[in-house]
Amino acid sequence: MLLRWLARPAERCLGRGGGGGGGGGGDGLLWHAELKPHASGEYSIAVAQANAELEDQGQVVTSPAATFVGVYDGHGGPEASRFISSRLFPHLHRFASEQGGMSTDAIKRAFHATEEEFLHMVKRSWLKQPQIASVGSCCLVGAITDNVLYVANLGDSRAVLGRRGPDGREVVAERLSNDHNVAEEEVRKELTEQHPDDSRIVIYTRGVWRIKGIIQVSRSIGDVYLKKPEFARDPIFRQYVCSIPLKRPVMTAEPSIKEHQLRQQDLFLIFASDGLWEQLTDKAAVDIVFKNPRAGIAKRLVRAALTEAARKREMRYTDIKHIERGSRRNFHDDITVVVVYLDHHKHGVRPNLGNRNSFRFTNAPVDIFSGSSEEVDHHPLRLNLAMDGAVG
């Protein structure tokens, strides 16, 4: 019962629609929340849905001492990204609290705990629902505390820092995450070295590089059949889900983690799923944030990406926004964007992350059907229940 309650946090507040903060200017598949405060500034969040079921999930958790951002880009279905949205932060809070503060080790342990918990769920469910073994999600996390930013990721969602340039009038884009995607030559080389006896570990098919001809990302939460060969070898799974046999794991859940000391010239952060970065360069995105008002800035980035997606098809954004979910995936991917402004940097004693009552949760909707619902801002009591479920 508790897991079902946790699995759909946004749905409890939104129903199954989205659209807080006034919707997307006539786009029923674009949702955003109004500008909100965090420990060292303000943040903005927006989501555009393309798939029949929204496979992206985004969340921001704030307290007086810390800010946490999560962007989870699912594939094969929404189950993994929704699972991460309900489980990762409770694990991270627990491990960081046990260690007396945020650290790369606490983040790594939280990722591993989430992966193991998802694996257990798959083992319980997969005989009745074999496709659950093929569901996965990229996972991008940012945590700010005591003037230090931690960025951790699996997959190809991306965190980009906008910092003031030397002349003070321009902004420089600095990427803070690694793309675990076989489109990157370095990732292909890594896989080839790990699988020297498999000449087909990475295949160019359908216009892109894919691991075993199946998937583009090399690290994720989930995708159990590509990490646990016994699932891929099962006759039922091979008949109904994937017929390619595997001898050993071809993906991992080992996050790349970067620790960055915030500086006065660091102005803002953009966390986004690859749906944004498929359309906009890092520099184009930071220029949009730097040159425009804060109100609705995440929505502005999403609309810029949708405009570019339309341009590539010799269309206008006004044409795309009338296309229904599902069909819209032919033009762009689901897009989740969180912009975090860095207005003041707090120095001093390493702070306690805060007790459970001090956190405020903002989750993007589970699905977006309209532009009229209220934005999601979870009461601390709900977070208490989530924490209790994680620790128990």
UniProtKB/Swiss-Prot annotation:
EC annotation from Swiss-Prot or TrEMBL: 3.1.3.16
Cofactors demanded by this protein: Mg(2+); Mn(2+)
Query: Where on the tree of life does the source sit, at the highest rank?
Result: Eukaryota
Q: Which residues bind Mn(2+) 1?
A: 73-74
Q: Which residues bind Mn(2+) 2?
A: 73, 274, 333
Q: Do you know which PROSITE patterns this protein is assigned to?
A: PPM_1, PPM_2
What is its EC class?
A: hydrolase
- Can you state which reaction this protein catalyses? O-phospho-L-seryl-[protein] + H2O = L-seryl-[protein] + phosphate; O-phospho-L-threonyl-[protein] + H2O = L-threonyl-[protein] + phosphate
Checking CDD domains in the record gives: PP2Cc
Q: How, per the record, is the cofactor bound?
A: Binds 2 magnesium or manganese ions per subunit.
Q: Where is the PPM-type phosphatase domain?
A: 39-342
Keyword line: Hydrolase, Magnesium, Manganese, Metal-binding, Protein phosphatase
User: Which PANTHER family is this protein grouped with?
Assistant: PROTEIN PHOSPHATASE (PTHR47992)
Protein name, per record:
Probable protein phosphatase 2C 78
Q: Which organism is it from?
A: Oryza sativa subsp. japonica
